[in-house]
């Protein structure tokens, strides 16, 4: 069951096999929206107790500030370099067979109610326990992408004020945090990709405080407003209280304005109080959108799609870095960045490709130029498929295994 559901993020495409919407000019939205006890410290709103903070801090009485990236990576128990991760479409057995050892492994949690992620193992919620333990046994940090809001259809804002749906929704969020707390170790949590873009697109004046939502029914959130803004704040507040070792990140969707405007929208939902920023790279191999008759998951956008490695023409890598940097500055609190759902195709001068073998150059560029990302406050890059027809480590001809090995042999990109 969940081998299919792992492709949960939809970017507006509807259904379990879509991909996450990314940056304006780079990925857009396929629906057409715009083109406890602590380990190293407790982060809350960019402040810390103990040994560090997601937004910078100090350790051991040393008054020197610790970069936010270093502080977060230290809490994860990983080396002080830009970390590499793998997500959906890249099974552990393939990592093992190719001797790939990622720092992070990402897994989707999808659905609400019958057939949702809590039911995938027994007892309810054990999917988190078993998945995390397998990932940890392989030496990686578990990351979970919470993708429950798309259950009733992406962009369906009526769900957030529906008592039956939200009762199930919050029960599963609580169960998620309880299972994470029981692990006793840090995990990363990516909170509801795409949803915040739909909130901004549909809210009057793009203000999440003007969409009604059921929030204050949760004891940890009784003082929060019953709005979509309060919903985001509750995800953070509940996590802090139930699973203080969980590190939380919000993914902005760049459909609704400039980086500064989107930062204001995301501050309203509490994104500045999280531990990191989830930068949605782009959700499809470029070649999948270039073919004359693309699969459904690659339709609905206009090109060009293949990014310019010389960074002279649009779209290109420096543009996307600048956009996220501007967002980070406007959001405040100096949060570190995790690039997510980064496509895994292989470079080619010939546009297009075939299913599972479409061209793309993100792996090649980002692993060869990882220091650019380290210099812009990145602490991790997670590579994964955004749909069932995209390239993975199973079909990339060994590209990721080779380039990640070379990256690690060079010592990795330093953190800023």
Please name every model-derived segment.
Residues 81-83, 102-106, 139-143, 186-190, ...:
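Structural preference for beta-strand elements that scaffold enzyme active sites
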Residues 5-8:
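C-terminal motif of bacterial Sec signal peptides marking the signal peptidase cleavage site
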Residues 60-113, 119, 381:
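Boundary/entry segment of secreted carbohydrate-active catalytic domains
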Residues 13-64:
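Ser/Thr-rich, Pro/Gly/Ala-heavy low-complexity intrinsically disordered linkers and tails
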Residues 190-192, 219-262, 279, 332-347:
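Aromatic-lined carbohydrate-recognition surfaces of secreted/lumenal glycan-active proteins
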